[in-house]
């Protein structure tokens, strides 16, 4: 028992998380009531991550830009290209899987208090309005687009500030990073609570009726994770991409799978990027930006569920129409973080391409909520792990050129 306690509280973080995961599963099967009770540990962990993430991003970006080194802008451009390309290829992969495995839905009612966006213009409007949000509201509401805008806006003039100001900002950044390390250190306990509550509440039989739909979704996501993303990484680093891919999956994807929040996983990704040698001035901008626009998982969800809705209505789109859907899904996915409800609420917008009525599209959202425990977890794991994967790959490629 003392050996187990040592591993759980002082050992390697990944091993500790794995132990917490296994213990959570066991508790859910042994005593579901107790498992639901310990769910508060998981809720506390997620709330802690969400609480620290906005101030972490603001302080780190502000400090990084104020102390910015020459050449950072050149490194951000290829990272943005990777984000956009990865999201589009993910949507295209979802189209291919949906064509090979066409899926019909058992439609149910969706929650009545949800209001999906009415068009791409509304999504763009949301993003632009978030960009000029009040800085205090942006921090309070975890509006990362607004936080980035204010941090960059203040950071640029602070590059000309006195050295003492830059030292203060750097010290403040170190202090926030220390708090983040403290929060991450309790990740095994948080994962234990999240897993125990999830399995005790939903059970393993809740997803059988939607096994085919989940199979298409997860198959597309796995293809992106283990085939397309490594190809993109190899394009940058020109060596075996899988060691880096597996590190990012193990240390970022696993946590994101259970927190189901890209924003909450930002501190985890920042910590991992630092250990992988990514400079702070790169990671502090690229990682939060990735949590906002790098949405491969969301693009897959929107594409698969939209095509499933089309098949259910007897609509069989040709490949060019599906290609257009991929482009629309990619654009929509980039705005998913700016829409309450995430990728599921963007489905009616994509369904409008096929003239699918809004009431049918709303029922597709209901299906999304049924499978959401698995779908949202896998989607977030893909989204968040590729943030740090692409950032690290570009950083290593640029460092190799400079050496």
Curated annotation (Swiss-Prot):
GO terms for biological process: serine transport; threonine transport. Disulfide bonds: none annotated. It comes from the Bacteria. GO terms for cellular component: plasma membrane. Keywords: Amino-acid transport, Cell inner membrane, Cell membrane, Membrane, Symport, Transmembrane, Transmembrane helix, Transport. Its main location: membrane. Gene3D superfamilies: Sodium:dicarboxylate symporter. It catalyses: L-serine(in) + Na(+)(in) = L-serine(out) + Na(+)(out); L-threonine(in) + Na(+)(in) = L-threonine(out) + Na(+)(out). SUPFAM superfamilies: Proton glutamate symport protein. It is a multi-pass membrane protein. GO terms for molecular function: neutral L-amino acid:sodium symporter activity. It is found in: Cell inner membrane. The chain crosses the membrane at residues 11-31, 51-71, 81-101, 138-158, 175-195, 213-233, 285-305, 319-339. Belongs to the dicarboxylate/amino acid:cation symporter (DAACS) (TC 2.A.23) family. Involved in the import of serine and threonine into the cell, with the concomitant import of sodium (symport system). This is Serine/threonine transporter SstT. It comes from Haemophilus ducreyi (strain 35000HP / ATCC 700724). The lineage of its organism: Bacteria, Pseudomonadati, Pseudomonadota, Gammaproteobacteria, Pasteurellales. The gene is sstT.
